[in-house]
Amino acid sequence: MRFDAAFVRKFLTFGCIGGGVYVFDASCFWLFIQLTGWPSLARVISVALAMTLSWWLNRTFTFRVNGPVNWGEMIKFMLSQLPGACINALFSLLAFHYLPFAKDNTWIATAVGSCAGLVANFTMAHLFVFNKNRNA
């Protein structure tokens, strides 16, 4: 990976999209809890919608892929984000348990996890999903 201006633009775009998708995910989670009364079902629905939106936005704006929708690419994207999700969860829990101010401000623990997961998620998407050289 080269850290040139194009790479930095992609990384920053990926991060901004992630922030927007987080708001979308949290909103959907709240909405589907209200509609179904089942938090577990609401979470599954909100995560599925958020991951789909994340794939489409990153495909379109971060990696600038043109052409028809590629469902295999979407599945590959979702699978590629699993390591980042695990890193996110781990760092969120570590922050929650070991940063005294994070226990009362869970958004801090969530932010720590999100930042740690961002690096893994971007790397996986950049190298394994939207890498033109690898996918040629």
Give short role names for the model-derived ranges:
Residues M1-A136:
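Alpha-helical membrane-protein topology signature
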